[in-house]
Structures are given as structure tokens and as C-alpha cells.
Amino acid sequence: MARIAGVNIPSNKRVCIALTYIYGIGRTKAGEICERTGIAENRRVNDLSDDEVVRIREIIDSEYKVEGDLRREVAMNIKRIMDLGCYRGLRHRKGLPVRGQRTHTNARTRKGPAKPIAGKKK
């Protein structure tokens, strides 16, 4: 099991799939990384040499924002919007959908489980 960007990469999977276990790297970026390091996408992680793992690690560390740094940046962006007091920030604060979805019905994922209202019956 190789360790890249603080994540244990599963050794029995193909390289392009295994790299997606890192937060911030999807299928497209994983394909780019494999192409730039000269590693075939269909090779398994346990078939990689230590040198190839080091090359992957260097590219990810130098050029991509992943894991903790990316999570921190996303959280800071949301916090900045909330501090501005703009409409999107208010929606984040209230725990409602931010991107214009309807809330009269639906939006249960964002709002949480339904809260019963006393005296309300049909």
C-alpha cells in the first residue's frame, strides 16, 4: 500500500483509480498525472516501483492542492462569504440551499429531518 499525500492508496487497484482516493483528485487529474509521469493507467499500484511512486508524489505535492490544504481553502471560502453577509453567505448560515433550489418542498438534505409543528394537521 503506497502512501501519497497522506493517504494510503489501495495496492490492488489500477493507478488512475487508486489516485482518486486522494481528496481533490478525480479521474481527469489522475489521468493527467499518469500521463505526465509516463505510467500506463491500467498498471496496478503494487506493480509500481518506488521511483514511480516518488515521481507521482512529487507531481501531486508541487502542482495540485489536495487533502487538508484544499479542505481548508474551501472552508475559508465559505467562511469569507458568510462574513460578507451576502445572500449566499446568509443561506450558508441558515443551513438552506445556496444555489437557488426550491425550499417549500424538498431540500431535506440541506435542512435536515422534518421538524414537527404543534397543532398542524390536515
From Swiss-Prot:
GO terms for cellular component: cytosol; small ribosomal subunit. Keywords: Ribonucleoprotein, Ribosomal protein, RNA-binding, rRNA-binding, tRNA-binding. One of its GO terms (molecular function) is tRNA binding. SUPFAM superfamilies: S13-like H2TH domain (SSF46946). GO terms for biological process: translation. Residues 95-122 are annotated as: Disordered. InterPro entries: Rbsml_uS13_C (IPR027437), Ribosomal_uS13 (IPR001892), Ribosomal_uS13-like_H2TH (IPR010979), Ribosomal_uS13_bac-type (IPR019980), Ribosomal_uS13_CS (IPR018269). NCBIfam families: uS13_bact. Located at the top of the head of the 30S subunit, it contacts several helices of the 16S rRNA. In the 70S ribosome it contacts the 23S rRNA (bridge B1a) and protein L5 of the 50S subunit (bridge B1b), connecting the 2 subunits; these bridges are implicated in subunit movement. Contacts the tRNAs in the A and P-sites. Belongs to the universal ribosomal protein uS13 family. Part of the 30S ribosomal subunit. Forms a loose heterodimer with protein S19. Forms two bridges to the 50S subunit in the 70S ribosome. This is Small ribosomal subunit protein uS13. It comes from Rhodospirillum rubrum (strain ATCC 11170 / ATH 1.1.1 / DSM 467 / LMG 4362 / NCIMB 8255 / S1). The gene is rpsM.
